[in-house]
Design a protein with these regions (language model features):
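The alpha-helix within a helix-turn-helix
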Residues: 9, 20, 49
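A short, Lys/Arg-rich alpha-helix, primarily the initiator
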Residues: 1-15
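Recognition helix of helix-turn-helix/homeodomain-like DNA-binding domains
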Residues: 25-39
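Phosphate-coordinating loops and pocket residues in cytosolic domains that bind phosphorylated ligands
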Residues: 61
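DNA major-groove recognition helix of helix-turn-helix/homeodomain DNA-binding modules
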Residues: 43-58
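Helix-turn-helix DNA-binding elements, focusing on the entry/boundary residues of the two helices
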Residues: 16, 27, 42-45
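Residues in the helix-turn-helix
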Residues: 18, 29, 58
């Protein structure tokens, strides 16, 4: 999932910090996803999908 998130960051020239500020998802949560310390919760996935204008399924492919 984080790979897809990283692709979207690159495509949109955003940083994880910007996404955190814009969505209210804590940077520590994004960092935990990157390191595989925690699983992505559905509500957060929905927020990210809406933010980037993609479907939830995009992250699950």
């Amino acid at each position: 999932m984080y790979e897809k998130f990283a692709e979207l960051l690159d495509k949109t020239n955003k940083t994880a910090y910007q996404v955190s500020k814009d969505t209210g998802i804590a940077q520590s949560v994004l960092s935990d996803w990157k390191r595989g310390r925690s699983n992505v919760k559905t509500d957060k996935l929905k927020i990210l999908a809406d933010y980037f204008g993609v479907s939830i399924e995009y992250f699950l492919e």
